[in-house]
């Protein structure tokens, strides 16, 4: 299980990469959270499947994937993105942003408490996605965060537990120091978990 439904605006449509003579494109999708904030999500798709234009509002179904991208310094950066064939949701989405994904907890951090007393926990979910019309399996490692009582519940879980999660895919910006006086603004993506259950 790996399904996400999004409603938002496409921007910055541009070429991404090419595999077996099939061209792929990428874009930013601007998704309104409903509280005045916006998420900027990475979208990828086959070029021929895109019938939309810049700044057009779309509703789509896809799945959340990860890609380990090599950097010039020899390290790797994990990008989180949504791959879609631009399938349209069967019903009008209740939310602009919702996912349902199952998998295995492969990393589980200690629960944390913020300065204002709120609890949160980070974990990584390993998801095995079987590509449609093929026997190919795609492994993704998805960063997750949960807050409050749900964070306390997850803190009792263990690595290798099989779970199913629901929530929203969010973006957040942060500062990365490149020198003592200079910094760069970076964007990270993570799954905000609002529901979780163990599965056999």
Language model feature labels by segment:
Residues 1-200:
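Single-stranded nucleic acid-binding surfaces, predominantly the OB-fold ssDNA-binding core
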């Amino acid at each position: 299980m790996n399904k996400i439904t999004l409603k938002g605006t496409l921007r910055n449509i541009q070429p991404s990469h090419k595999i077996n003579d099939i061209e792929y494109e990428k874009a930013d999708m601007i998704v309104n959270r409903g509280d005045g904030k916006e998420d900027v999500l990475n979208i990828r798709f086959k070029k021929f499947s895109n019938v939309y234009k810049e700044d057009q509002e779309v509703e789509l179904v896809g799945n959340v994937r990860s890609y380990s991208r090599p950097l010039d310094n020899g390290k790797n950066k994990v990008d989180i993105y949504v791959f879609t064939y631009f399938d349209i949701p069967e019903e009008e989405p209740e939310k602009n942003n919702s996912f349902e994904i199952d998998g295995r907890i492969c990393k589980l951090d200690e629960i944390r408490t913020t300065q204002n007393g709120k609890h949160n926990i980070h974990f990584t979910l390993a998801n095995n996605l079987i590509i449609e019309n093929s026997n190919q399996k795609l492994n993704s490692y998805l960063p997750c965060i949960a807050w409050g009582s749900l964070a306390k519940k997850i803190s009792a879980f263990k690595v290798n537990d099989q779970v199913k999660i629901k929530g929203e895919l969010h973006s957040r910006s942060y500062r990365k120091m490149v020198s003592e006086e200079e910094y760069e603004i970076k964007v990270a993506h993570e799954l905000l978990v609002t529901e979780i259950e163990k599965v056999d």
